[in-house]
């Protein structure tokens, strides 16, 4: 299976993660997903009155140095890990 196809499959699986998944892990997945699909951060950092959006932006910025392919691989690995932990 091609990396992009596997990534898309795991993006669907990520939506089945339990609500108990930590915010930290959700933010890691968000950052890797954005890096995989958009690439480097292309917006300014949200202000302090938007803490949720700011945390998401920070998670994306944290993985900015990864290639799209590397981010896809890391995303797949993280989703697999979280699914195993929740089983």
Swiss-Prot record:
Example GO BP: fatty acid metabolic process
GO MF term list: fatty-acyl-CoA binding
SUPFAM superfamilies in the cross-refs: Acyl-CoA binding protein
Binding site for an acyl-CoA: 30-34, 56, 75
Pfam families: ACBP
Alphabetically ordered keywords of this record: Lipid-binding, Transport
Domain ACB: 3-87
Family the entry assigns: Belongs to the ACBP family.
Function: Binds medium- and long-chain acyl-CoA esters with very high affinity and may function as an intracellular carrier of acyl-CoA esters.
Record's protein name: Acyl-CoA-binding protein
Annotated organism of origin: Fritillaria agrestis
